[in-house]
Amino acid sequence: MDPTVGWIALLAFFVVSIALVVWGRNGF
């Protein structure tokens, strides 16, 4: 498995979790 794939998955997970937190705070 390419290490880059792991980094992309980790980054995507981080971005999604941040987006969900911001989204939740805005009351959507």
From Swiss-Prot:
Q: Does the keyword Membrane apply?
A: yes
The UniProt keyword set, sorted, is: Cell inner membrane, Cell membrane, Electron transport, Membrane, Transmembrane, Transmembrane helix, Transport
Q: How does it sit in the membrane?
A: Single-pass membrane protein
Where does it live in the cell? Answer: Cell inner membrane
Q: What does this protein do?
A: Component of the cytochrome b6-f complex, which mediates electron transfer between photosystem II (PSII) and photosystem I (PSI), cyclic electron flow around PSI, and state transitions.
Which HAMAP family does this entry report, sorted A to Z? Cytb6_f_PetN
Q: How does it assemble?
A: The 4 large subunits of the cytochrome b6-f complex are cytochrome b6, subunit IV (17 kDa polypeptide, PetD), cytochrome f and the Rieske protein, while the 4 small subunits are PetG, PetL, PetM and PetN. The complex functions as a dimer.
Q: Describe the family membership recorded for this protein in Swiss-Prot or TrEMBL.
A: Belongs to the PetN family.
- For this entry, the protein name equals Cytochrome b6-f complex subunit 8
Per the UniProt entry, what species is this protein from, by scientific name?
Gloeobacter violaceus (strain ATCC 29082 / PCC 7421)
